[in-house]
């Protein structure tokens, strides 16, 4: 038998798949339209990919934690708890992620010598936050799913 966590990791790979594919195309088109520098393109793409991983993990984790097995209409696939908690959690995650990625480098206006350090620290914090969110959401979902007894 396959572990619940491995099952959720496989589902996460499928849920996350649109972000690298569609996200790259959209970021590339917007960068071309804005005549953005290559570094700005890479920064935007990294932000889309990291935040996409976090939001996908949250949605998947909440869906696994509060499953509905008796749905017949795809619109009623989510339980009320999963449908209410997931958007709140991933909007909070997005807010914190944006505060980290834009807030720390903005402090460089006060201390210009630390601009590079603050930028690197902000990206490392975002990577750490995303890893923590993905691990937490999937672990929570797997633990709750393991408790489900099908009758």
Question: PLM features: what roles do these ranges have?
Answer:
Residues 3-151:
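Hydrophobic alpha-helical transmembrane segments of membrane proteins
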């Amino acid at each position: 038998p396959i572990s619940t966590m491995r099952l959720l990791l496989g589902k996460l790979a499928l849920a996350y798949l649109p972000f690298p594919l569609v996200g790259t195309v959209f970021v590339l088109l917007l960068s071309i339209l804005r005549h953005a520098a290559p570094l700005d393109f890479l920064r935007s793409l990294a932000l889309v990919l990291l935040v996409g991983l976090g939001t996908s993990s949250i949605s998947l984790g909440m869906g696994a934690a509060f499953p509905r097995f008796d749905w017949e209409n795809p619109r009623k696939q989510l339980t009320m708890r999963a449908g209410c908690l997931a958007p709140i959690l991933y909007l909070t995650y997005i807010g914190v992620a944006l505060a980290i990625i834009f807030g720390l480098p903005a402090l460089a206006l006060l201390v210009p010598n630390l601009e590079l350090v603050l930028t690197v620290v902000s990206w490392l914090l975002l990577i750490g936050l995303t890893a923590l969110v993905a691990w937490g959401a999937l672990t929570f979902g797997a633990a709750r799913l393991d408790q489900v007894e099908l009758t």
